[in-house]
């Protein structure tokens, strides 16, 4: 890659993002602008995938809302994301957890990673 492009993208990378992977439960604080009013909206769920690297990296969070699965994809370096909190680290054996889309209730649970 061109050194000039590398330098420009390095300036735009966020360094305040916590370390999280697929299977972790996170709470994403998103800035929502409605007219002139700005507020923070939280989206809490399980990270089902991380994709890409550098400036174009994204992650997808899935949650259940009134029995309906809702997935939202966020760029890692999105300025609209105020903060990401990692609530628990899940123990999974896959990088992409697409199988959670077919599971409901207790079958969709993810075991918590043991400390040690």
UniProtKB/Swiss-Prot annotation:
MF terms in GO: structural constituent of ribosome
Q: What does this protein do?
A: This protein is located at the 30S-50S ribosomal subunit interface and may play a role in the structure and function of the aminoacyl-tRNA binding site.
Q: Which UniProt keywords apply?
A: Ribonucleoprotein, Ribosomal protein
Q: Which Pfam families match?
A: Ribosomal_L19 (PF01245)
- HAMAP family for the chain: Ribosomal_bL19
What would be one Gene Ontology cellular-component term for the protein? cytosolic large ribosomal subunit
Example GO biological process: translation
Recorded coiled-coil stretches: none
Official protein name in the record: Large ribosomal subunit protein bL19
Q: Does the keyword Lipid biosynthesis apply?
A: no
Query: What is the top-level taxon of the source organism?
Result: Bacteria
**Which species is the source of this protein?**
Lactobacillus gasseri (strain ATCC 33323 / DSM 20243 / BCRC 14619 / CIP 102991 / JCM 1131 / KCTC 3163 / NCIMB 11718 / NCTC 13722 / AM63)
Which InterPro entries does the record cross-reference, listed alphabetically? Ribosomal_bL19 (IPR001857), Ribosomal_bL19_CS (IPR018257), Ribosomal_bL19_sf (IPR038657), Translation_prot_SH3-like_sf (IPR008991)
Q: Which family does it belong to?
A: Belongs to the bacterial ribosomal protein bL19 family.
Taxonomic lineage is:
Bacteria, Bacillati, Bacillota, Bacilli, Lactobacillales
């Amino acid at each position: 890659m061109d050194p000039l492009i590398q330098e420009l993208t390095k300036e735009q990378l966020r360094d305040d993002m916590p370390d999280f992977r697929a299977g972790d439960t996170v709470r994403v604080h998103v800035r929502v602008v409605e007219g002139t009013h700005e507020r923070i909206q939280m989206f809490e769920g399980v990270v089902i995938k991380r994709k890409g690297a550098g400036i174009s990296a994204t992650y997808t969070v899935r949650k259940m809302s009134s029995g309906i699965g809702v997935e939202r994809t966020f760029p890692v370096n999105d300025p609209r994301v105020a903060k990401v909190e990692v609530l628990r680290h899940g123990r999974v054996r896959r990088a992409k957890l697409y199988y959670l889309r077919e599971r409901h209730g207790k079958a969709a649970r993810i075991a918590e990673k043991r400390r040690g």
